[in-house]
């Protein structure tokens, strides 16, 4: 899914401007507001999590809506479009930085992947216990993508299975769906493909769990 990077709601605009605390944040925001179409997977995933935790008034966006699924289409609802773009653009802000991260350029032999996967599994276990999903971002050959982590179980082999909702992909004919990321019991490897079974060669990137 893609949208033109333009927010008409002054409330969201003011929030973004007030949180641009330094030159780099402002520059990142300016480059986003060039008006061209942009992917909004992060905005959708993040707003899904905030909505689940009660931070979003669904009825204010779409009259009568009581959850994310009853909001309708952002292409037909400017309030929903602005909400998604707002959360998409919070990536430009210092306050919108990820909770945990691993650099795709750091290599896999220095222990960073193992540390990240341990934190990832711990967060998934906690999220299941308190029923609060969070956002997971990763890199694929075509670019970055964000999804919602919403479940966890440990299988009989001692490996970890993390349930993920992939809300969409930017490929033609793509669709949303649930999938499983498998993490080995020693946290040294993982197996993952998106909801369209496109990618096994994934570089893990970031977790967003501090949703407040």
Residue ranges and their predicted role:
Residues 1-115:
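Cysteine-nucleophile protease catalytic domains, especially the papain-like/related folds used
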Residues 106-165:
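Active-site-adjacent substructure of cysteine-protease-like catalytic cores
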Residues 15-18, 26, 79-81, 104, ...:
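Context-gated lysine
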Residues 43-46, 50-56, 150-152, 166, ...:
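Generic ordered-secondary-structure signal
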Residues 141-143, 153-212:
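Cys-His-centered catalytic/binding microenvironment captured across papain-like cysteine peptidases
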Residues 5, 45, 65, 122-127, ...:
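A sequence-composition feature that detects small, non-aromatic residues
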């Amino acid at each position: 899914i893609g949208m033109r990077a333009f927010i008409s709601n002054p409330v969201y605009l003011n929030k973004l401007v007030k949180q641009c605390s330094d030159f780099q944040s402002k520059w990142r925001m300016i480059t986003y507001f060039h008006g061209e179409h942009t992917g909004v997977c992060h905005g959708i995933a993040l707003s899904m999590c905030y909505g689940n935790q009660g931070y979003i008034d669904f009825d204010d966006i779409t009259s009568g809506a009581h959850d994310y699924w009853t909001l309708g289409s952002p292409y037909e609802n400017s309030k929903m479009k602005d909400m998604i773009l707002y959360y998409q653009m919070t990536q430009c802000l210092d306050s919108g930085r990820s909770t945990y991260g691993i650099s795709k350029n750091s290599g896999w032999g220095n222990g960073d992947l193992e540390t990240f996967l341990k934190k990832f599994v711990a967060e998934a276990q906690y999220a299941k216990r308190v029923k609060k999903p969070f956002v997971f971002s990763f890199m694929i050959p075509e670019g970055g993508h964000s999804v919602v982590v919403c479940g966890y179980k440990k299988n009989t082999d001692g490996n970890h299975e993390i349930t993920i909702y992939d809300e969409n992909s930017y490929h033609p004919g793509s669709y949303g769906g649930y999938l499983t990321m498998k993490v080995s019991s020693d946290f040294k490897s993982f197996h993952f493909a998106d909801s369209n079974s496109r990618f096994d060669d994934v570089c893990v990137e970031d977790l967003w769990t501090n949703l407040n």
